[in-house]
Regions:
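Acidic, polar-rich low-complexity tracts and alpha-helical solenoid repeat scaffolds
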Residues: 1-161
Length: 161
């Protein structure tokens, strides 16, 4: 128990290194499976939830940092990984929103040979987002992005033959 607690109190906040947090999760999980009858079991389960939340937040912040500095390709990969790793994240709407915007910005900043595919990819993200969050506060902005994508696709499709 003390061993697990030490790790818990050493665990850093989300924006710092997460190795200790991962070790704490392992230690607490082992404690829970070894001593399921412990009188402290609920406290340990709460700690586990909190530590998992920290890792989830860290994963989101990493992806968001790529977005903020304009590394849109890396942002898309990081946001997708975050969703895969933490499907229960409370930030799902934000992640899907930033993925769509990142895809759009990547498309607009791409060399011409890559633009068509990237505008099409942006539309895919857009439809996923709108399917999941039809009433989102981001809807109008993303509708505009989708219109721009469609305009590009319509203008350039004919010339590709």
């Amino acid at each position: 128990g003390m061993y697990a607690l030490c790790y818990y109190y050493m665990a850093p906040s989300p924006e710092r290194d997460q190795t200790i947090t991962s070790q704490a999760i392992i230690a607490i999980t082992e404690f829970i499976s070894r001593y399921p009858e412990s009188e402290h079991i609920n406290e340990y389960k709460e700690m586990l939830d909190e530590l998992s939340g920290r890792l989830m937040e860290k994963s989101y912040l990493n992806a968001y940092t790529y977005y903020k500095i304009g590394r849109y390709k890396s942002a898309i990969v990081a946001f997708k990984n975050s969703m895969k790793q933490y499907p229960e994240t409370p930030r799902k709407e934000e992640i899907m929103y930033y993925t769509t915007v990142s895809a759009y910005r990547l498309a607009t900043n791409s060399v011409e040979s890559k633009q068509m595919d990237r505008y099409l990819a942006t539309l895919d993200y857009y439809y996923s987002f709108i399917g999941e969050y039809p009433e989102s506060k981001h809807k109008r902005e993303l509708d505009n992005i989708a219109d721009n994508c469609r305009d590009y696709i319509d203008k350039n499709r004919k010339t590709e033959q």
